[in-house]
Every structure is written in structure tokens, then in C-alpha cells.
Swiss-Prot record:
UniProt key word Secreted: yes
Location(s), subcellular: Secreted
Protein's UniProt name: Leptin
SUPFAM superfamilies named in the record: 4-helical cytokines
Function (record text): Key player in the regulation of energy balance and body weight control. Once released into the circulation, has central and peripheral effects by binding LEPR, found in many tissues, which results in the activation of several major signaling pathways.
Gene: LEP
One of the record's GO cellular component terms: extracellular space
Keyword Secreted: yes
Pfam families the record matches: Leptin
Origin: domain of life: Eukaryota
């Protein structure tokens, strides 16, 4: 299967996830907003390789699955599918991505979730949206492993 198919499917899923995030009304917060205790959520920085994309998405997936909000369940599932597509894309380019499914849960996550549920969701979704836009741009220039 040509890697272009995986790349196209990946782009389509990213656009779907961005649309889902836009449909959740409270995401009009800046991705650059700083909220004390949420520094474990990846910020906006260039994501240049497939392995870095996967690592970043794994953190977002972990954060979103830890939130009790029904709004983010579908997005978390979409992230799992997106990571699977990235692995297929990497495989089609003869890359091997390290398994990141067993990520270490940030120590601060449980305490932060109790105290800042709403803020965590807003910041995570806002930053995820920015990261997805960045990944979409990187896919256009065919990222390295």
C-alpha cells in the first residue's frame, strides 16, 4: 500500500479531530495560555518527526482519557486511531516508531484533575488543536522518522 494513502487518511482524521474540538464551545482559549500545574501538557513547538508526533499525541491521549468529560472521549479515541495511522505511515517509510502506549503518568495529573478539571480540558484541547495543525503542515512536507 503506498504511503500516500496512509498520509491522506492521517490528514483526513486530523481535520476530523480539529472539527470535533471546534464543536466543543469552550475552546476559545489561547493555546499559549499558561495555567499553573498544567506544564505536563505539550505546548506549541514544531513537531518535525513521526516519532515526535506519536509521543506528543500519546501525552494528549493520556490526558484526555483521564478527564471525566464526555466531550473528550471521542477525541481520545480518534487520537488512538491517529497514532495507529502514524505507525502505518512510519512502517510504509521503513521507519520504526518506539512503543509509547505505556507512558508514565505525570505525577501532578491526579491532583491537577481534581482542582482544575475545566481548565485542564480547555488547555489540553486548545494545545492539541495547535499541535494537530502543526502535524498537518509537517505531513505536507513528508516528515522524517
Amino acid at each position: 500500500v503506498p504511503c500516500q494513502i496512509f498520509q491522506d487518511d492521517t490528514k483526513t482524521l486530523i481535520k476530523t479531530i480539529v472539527t470535533r474540538i471546534n464543536d466543543i464551545s469552550h475552546t476559545s482559549v489561547s493555546a499559549k495560555q499558561s495555567v499553573t500545574g498544567l506544564d505536563f501538557i505539550p505546548g506549541l513547538h514544531p513537531i518535525l518527526s513521526l516519532s515526535k508526533m506519536d509521543q506528543t499525541l500519546a501525552v494528549y491521549q493520556q490526558v484526555l482519557t483521564s478527564l471525566p468529560s464526555q466531550n473528550v472521549l471521542q477525541i481520545a479515541n480518534d487520537l488512538e486511531n491517529l497514532r495507529d495511522l502514524l505507525h502505518l505511515l512510519a512502517f510504509s517509510k521503513s521507519c520504526s516508531l518506539p512503543q509509547t502506549s505505556g507512558l508514565h503518568k505525570p505525577e501532578s495529573l491526579d491532583g491537577v484533575l481534581e482542582a482544575l478539571l475545566y481548565s485542564t480540558e480547555v488547555v489540553a484541547l486548545s494545545r492539541l488543536q495547535g499541535s494537530l495543525q502543526d502535524i498537518l503542515q509537517q505531513l505536507d512536507i513528508s516528515p522524517e522518522c
